[in-house]
Amino acid sequence: MQLSIIIPVYGSPESIKELCERVSTSLRGLVDSFEIILVDDECPDDSWSEIKKTTQTLPNVIGLKLSRNFGQHKAICAGLHESKGDYCVVMDCDLQDLPEDIPTLYEKAKEGNDVVLGQRIERQDKKFKVLKSKVFYYFFNLLSGLNSDPTVANFSIISRKVVTAYLSFKEQDIDYTNVINWLGFDAVKIPVRHAERKYGESSYNYWKLME
């Protein structure tokens, strides 16, 4: 069984090496093989140089560099296109998603679940950011007719069947979690830990979700 870890990168260059080392440690002995795909979304910092250094020291790491800043969800799509795993994990680069929780997601997927979503029961973001998230998703769900959960972000595992369906989806201006929701595969949610941001500040905002 092969596992692909898709990580869109924008900011947090300090976290890249530690993140990949912790992912590698968490996956040793869990699967036959794995790959970590870091997608540089044209970061205006040292992220690409850190990605290149990491690919030279960790053989399972692959670096992709986009030609311009396309946004987080298109970076995820680029990583999925490159992936070869029977299952793909999507996670953020800032170490708020804990690599040590990947085995829990994987074991749940092996029970026959095509989509397993990490549910952040105790978010470690600032209270104002959590409030903005709740307000955004309230109105987003009201207008879209979807049922998006503000406690669920990118941290998830999906089967190859779901990856294929995701990549055939032609709409480019909708985010990863809502595409997964729209595709209609049975999904289960499991609690995952959520760490405080260790390096830098988030560049993500809810206006980007509306683009």
Regions found by a protein language model. Give the residues of each.
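Acceptor/aglycone-binding surface of glycosyltransferases and processive sugar-polymer synthases
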Residues: I62-R68, Q72-E82, Y87, P99-V179, ...
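Short, well-formed alpha-helical segments that are part of the catalytic scaffolds
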Residues: S12-L27
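Cell-envelope/extracellular polymer assembly enzymes that use nucleotide-activated donors
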Residues: Q2-S4, E35
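A conserved acidic beta->alpha catalytic loop
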Residues: D40-S49, L95-Q96
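Acidic helix N-cap motif at the loop->helix transition within catalytic regions
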Residues: S15-K17, D45-T54
